[in-house]
């Protein structure tokens, strides 16, 4: 069960009488971040009752009175709320969804700076599942990408494609996704990119026949 924690605009709840009453009743203090943590814990309890696992798209701070359960899987992408290194130190299971180079945003974006979020297959090939980067200069990993040591707590990666027309998905992913898959599933051995991309091109010809392109 997926929760997009980064989309929670907690400022909207600071001066809501009903929210303030609820926080007082449940001894949550005055910090709405504690309300958010309370919500995440409650959701995790509900999800587990249905024999499911909760996936959390980061969004919660490292500091807080209410402890976030360690059986929650955290998808870490922005390196803003809770650094991947801290998530590992704190015992969480993590999926690498690093903005650079795993995002593919190719048109229709209201935020102009995010239009940079399209990286070449070669750039994706230089990434590994223990590495986080970001194109935004306000993030901690902008100048110094975070390369973590190999750990079983990082269980994989995810390529993220959004804010583009449906017919644009296959053209933008067809030569990037195979490279990403190679770096996730075959991270122990690495041939030169030029040699590997020959395989991608051959398989892409087969894809063209399948989809009649």
Report each predicted region and the residues it spans.
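Flexible, acidic glycine-rich loops studded with aromatic residues
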Residues: 53-59, 66-213
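Active-site neighborhood of glycoside hydrolase catalytic domains
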Residues: 1-72, 77-91
